[in-house]
Amino acid sequence: MKITFLGTCAAGAPNIPEAELPEDRRRCASLYIEGGVLVDVAIQSYDFANKQGIDTAGVTDIFLSHPHADHYNKGTLLAYAKNARQKLNLWCYKTSVPVLKLTDEDLEFVNVCPVDFMQEIETAGMRVKVLPGNHADGDAIHFVFEQDGKTLFYGLDGAWFTPREWHYLNDGKKPLSALIIDATMPNEPINYINAGEHNNVLLLPAVVRALKESGIAGENTPIIADHIGVPYHHKGTAPERLAAMGYIPAYDGMVLEI
């Protein structure tokens, strides 16, 4: 399983087109899984994916964690959909559908596939489990992608884990192959208003410890910090601090073979 990080910033990332983005700024959240799967479809995703040499016409499925503006952009979704070789599947939580604001004309290019918590999906040569995230009004979703014996957890926007999510991950199976963890607040000061729905500098080390002690992550399992907040650029202390906590700090354009 090969993944490419197309955007690694939290809300606060510049919500502007790729062509206008300063070189040192992180992009809004998006991830490509080789084989035609995209996770989150933020404003810069399509143009940056093309810059990275990704076959954007080969994208068949987009999984949307939630429709906040740093994860979803209708224009970017339609850029992927209208360029795709086949009609695109968009998987999102059932209450997100009205927020997408897709017209009948848009739906000629997109199959909207509403999902529920704990649902299992098979598409694009992989199995996907939908998990409840701890974010916003409780309608954000996380995913476990399984392909060719490899398993990837994607959990951006959420603090810690919801009980159902934790019990699913901690079911005694072998460790996951890799995990992508929310790292919205890796520095002080902590915004306690948002602390209930984003990981912060106090929680982040405990997440690594809990994953390893429970066996969800093995000793050498990559635990990747993504959705990185203040500062909203690749410079600064956040990557160093996250690495010291046991994370691989993600950056835009990072490619990882799991």
Task: Locate each region found by the language model.
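Active-site metal-binding loops of divalent metal-dependent hydrolases
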Residues: 8-9, 36, 43, 67, ...
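Divalent metal-coordination and catalytic microenvironments
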Residues: 3, 40, 49, 66, ...
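Short active-site oxyanion
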Residues: 35-37, 60, 85-90, 151-152, ...
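Cap/insert and terminal regions of metallo-dependent hydrolase folds
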Residues: 161-257
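Active-site metal-binding motif and surrounding structural segment of the metallo-beta-lactamase
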Residues: 43-91, 175-179
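Conserved beta-strand hairpin/beta-sheet module of binuclear metal-dependent hydrolase folds
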Residues: 1-52, 139-156
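Metallo-beta-lactamase
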Residues: 85, 91-141, 146-148, 247-256
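Short amphipathic alpha-helix with an adjacent loop that forms part of the alpha/beta core around
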Residues: 50-53, 121-124, 165-172
